[in-house]
């Protein structure tokens, strides 16, 4: 996925009220960005470091600028826009990058499923194979060299694991796909120290037949895309 038009840069001052961040531009002026990330952003906030943001020409938006990337102190990059994970996953599936998810005839987004009033991120269907239900999660938390999910207690994430297990019990294929938007994460594990119930459910889901995949993103201020698989430690 290319960033069009090109991203602009500034220096992070602060994130506040969950969905807002103040940034200083090169001329010394300050602007407020929309922060499109519902998580805690634990270990992803570095005041004084460079951020990259997009700008919308939609006059109805209260905040025209959206925070896209964060530069880490060691010059790494973090994808802040967690909502892009689904788009990145769809793009990678369509291009055949995720080898485990090839060979289907159609791809649908946000389809109702399960018994807890949920919508699946991606549904793959093919004439010669079971339907494949894919839940996509953005992984950005790095601690002691290990990537973790979630970065806060996630009741919604727990619900999605139950739904995936339900789909397996109905004879379908179910996949949890971690989209790793941190250049220094090379393996993903459940954050049992943050959400022990999620970690327990994930182990249960794997035993029930839910597949878990993780793919790293290659990121730059001009584009971002899924590139290669990484290790999952359940």
UniProtKB/Swiss-Prot annotation:
Taxonomy, superkingdom: Bacteria
Pfam families reported for this sequence: SfsA, SfsA_N
Coiled-coil portions: none
Gene3D superfamilies, per the entry: 2.40.50.580, 3.40.1350.60
CDD domains: SfsA-like_bacterial
MF-aspect GO terms: DNA binding
InterPro entries: SfsA, SfsA_C, SfsA_N
NCBIfam families in the cross-refs: sfsA
Family to which this protein belongs: Belongs to the SfsA family.
Protein name per Swiss-Prot or TrEMBL: Sugar fermentation stimulation protein homolog
Lineage: Bacteria, Pseudomonadati, Pseudomonadota, Gammaproteobacteria, Alteromonadales
Gene: sfsA
């Amino acid at each position: 996925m290319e960033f069009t038009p090109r991203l602009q840069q500034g220096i992070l001052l602060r994130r506040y009220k969950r969905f807002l961040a103040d940034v200083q531009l090169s001329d010394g002026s300050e602007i407020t960005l929309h922060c499109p990330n519902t998580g805690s952003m634990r270990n992803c906030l570095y005041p004084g470091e460079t951020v990259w943001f997009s700008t919308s020409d939609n006059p109805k938006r209260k905040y025209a600028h959206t925070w896209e990337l964060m530069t880490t102190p060691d010059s790494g990059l973090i994808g802040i826009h967690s909502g892009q994970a689904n788009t990145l996953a769809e793009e990678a599936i369509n291009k055949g990058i995720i080898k485990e998810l090839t060979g289907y005839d159609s791809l649908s987004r946000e389809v109702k499923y399960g018994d807890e009033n949920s919508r699946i991120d991606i549904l793959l269907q093919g004439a010669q194979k079971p339907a494949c239900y894919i839940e996509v999660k953005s992984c950005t938390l790095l601690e002691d060299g290990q990537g973790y999910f979630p970065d806060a207690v996630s009741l919604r994430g727990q619900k999605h694991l139950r739904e995936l297990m339900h789909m397996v019990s109905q004879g379908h294929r179910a996949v949890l796909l971690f989209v790793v938007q941190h250049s220094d994460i090379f393996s993903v594990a459940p954050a049992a120290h943050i959400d022990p119930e999620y970690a327990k459910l994930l182990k249960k889901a794997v035993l029930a037949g839910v597949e878990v995949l993780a793919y790293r993103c290659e990121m730059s201020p001009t584009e971002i895309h899924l590139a290669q698989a990484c290790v999952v430690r359940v």
